Protein backbone atom coordinates (compact mmCIF):
# COMPACT_ATOMS: atom_id res chain seq x y z
CA UNK A 1 0.00 0.00 0.00
CA UNK A 2 1.27 3.45 -0.87
CA UNK A 3 1.10 6.14 1.78
CA UNK A 4 1.38 9.81 0.87
CA UNK A 5 1.88 12.58 3.41
CA UNK A 6 -0.87 15.20 3.33
CA UNK A 7 1.47 18.06 2.36
CA UNK A 8 2.70 16.02 -0.63
CA UNK A 9 -0.92 15.26 -1.54
CA UNK A 10 -1.92 18.93 -1.44
CA UNK A 11 1.14 19.89 -3.48
CA UNK A 12 0.22 17.27 -6.08
CA UNK A 13 -3.37 18.50 -6.32
CA UNK A 14 -2.23 22.11 -6.73
CA UNK A 15 0.28 21.00 -9.39
CA UNK A 16 -2.55 19.38 -11.38
CA UNK A 17 -4.81 22.41 -10.94
CA UNK A 18 -2.11 24.79 -12.19
CA UNK A 19 -0.30 22.73 -14.82
CA UNK A 20 -2.51 19.73 -15.60
CA UNK A 21 -4.71 19.16 -18.62
CA UNK A 22 -8.47 19.61 -18.16
CA UNK A 23 -9.67 16.21 -19.34
CA UNK A 24 -6.82 14.13 -17.93
CA UNK A 25 -6.71 11.93 -14.82
CA UNK A 26 -3.61 11.92 -12.63
CA UNK A 27 -2.61 9.26 -10.10
CA UNK A 28 -1.22 10.70 -6.88
CA UNK A 29 0.68 8.33 -4.59
CA UNK A 30 4.06 7.86 -2.98
CA UNK A 31 5.08 4.66 -4.73
CA UNK A 32 8.70 5.00 -3.59
CA UNK A 33 7.81 3.39 -0.25
CA UNK A 34 5.07 0.77 -0.49
CA UNK A 35 4.29 -0.80 2.91
CA UNK A 36 1.98 -3.47 4.21
CA UNK A 37 -0.36 -2.28 6.97
CA UNK A 38 1.35 -4.56 9.50
CA UNK A 39 4.71 -2.93 8.63
CA UNK A 40 3.25 0.53 9.18
CA UNK A 41 1.92 -0.54 12.57
CA UNK A 42 5.31 -2.00 13.51
CA UNK A 43 7.08 1.16 12.34
CA UNK A 44 4.89 3.18 14.71
CA UNK A 45 5.79 0.84 17.58
CA UNK A 46 9.48 1.18 16.69
CA UNK A 47 9.28 4.98 16.54
CA UNK A 48 7.82 5.23 20.05
CA UNK A 49 9.33 2.41 22.15
CA UNK A 50 8.71 4.39 25.34
CA UNK A 51 4.96 3.89 24.84
CA UNK A 52 5.27 0.12 25.26
CA UNK A 53 3.06 -0.55 22.25
CA UNK A 54 2.78 -4.00 20.72
CA UNK A 55 1.38 -5.11 17.38
CA UNK A 56 -0.79 -8.22 17.55
CA UNK A 57 -1.81 -10.04 14.38
CA UNK A 58 -4.64 -12.51 14.06
CA UNK A 59 -5.40 -14.83 11.19
CA UNK A 60 -8.86 -14.08 9.81
CA UNK A 61 -11.42 -16.83 9.43
CA UNK A 62 -12.30 -18.12 5.97
CA UNK A 63 -15.46 -15.99 5.98
CA UNK A 64 -13.48 -12.83 6.64
CA UNK A 65 -10.82 -13.74 4.05
CA UNK A 66 -13.48 -13.75 1.34
CA UNK A 67 -13.79 -9.98 1.75
CA UNK A 68 -10.16 -9.39 0.80
CA UNK A 69 -8.67 -9.21 -2.66
CA UNK A 70 -6.17 -11.91 -3.53
CA UNK A 71 -3.44 -9.67 -4.96
CA UNK A 72 -0.93 -8.07 -2.63
CA UNK A 73 0.42 -4.96 -4.36
CA UNK A 74 -1.19 -2.59 -6.83
CA UNK A 75 1.16 0.12 -8.00
CA UNK A 76 -0.27 3.36 -9.34
CA UNK A 77 1.48 4.92 -12.31
CA UNK A 78 2.30 8.45 -11.14
CA UNK A 79 4.52 9.30 -14.11
CA UNK A 80 1.98 11.72 -15.65
CA UNK A 81 1.88 13.79 -12.45
CA UNK A 82 5.65 13.53 -12.07
CA UNK A 83 6.03 14.87 -15.63
CA UNK A 84 4.41 18.09 -14.34
CA UNK A 85 7.23 18.41 -11.81
CA UNK A 86 5.62 16.81 -8.73
CA UNK A 87 7.29 14.22 -6.56
CA UNK A 88 6.70 13.13 -2.96
CA UNK A 89 9.07 14.77 -0.47
CA UNK A 90 8.09 13.34 2.93
CA UNK A 91 8.99 9.72 3.65
CA UNK A 92 6.62 7.54 5.66
CA UNK A 93 8.64 7.58 8.89
CA UNK A 94 8.97 11.37 8.87
CA UNK A 95 5.28 11.76 8.04
CA UNK A 96 4.33 9.49 10.93
CA UNK A 97 6.49 11.51 13.32
CA UNK A 98 4.95 14.78 12.15
CA UNK A 99 1.44 13.39 12.47
CA UNK A 100 1.95 12.01 15.98
CA UNK A 101 3.66 15.25 17.07
CA UNK A 102 0.68 17.20 15.71
CA UNK A 103 -1.77 15.06 17.71
CA UNK A 104 0.32 15.49 20.86
CA UNK A 105 0.43 19.26 20.36
CA UNK A 106 -3.35 19.43 19.84
CA UNK A 107 -4.02 17.43 23.01
CA UNK A 108 -1.95 19.90 25.04
CA UNK A 109 -4.13 22.83 23.96
Model-identified regions with their sequence ranges:
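C-terminal substrate-binding subdomain of Rossmann-fold SDR/epimerase-dehydratase oxidoreductases
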Residues: 1-109
Amino acid sequence: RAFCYVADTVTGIVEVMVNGENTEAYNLANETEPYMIRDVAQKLVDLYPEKGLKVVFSNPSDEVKKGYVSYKIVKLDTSKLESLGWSPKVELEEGMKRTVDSFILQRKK
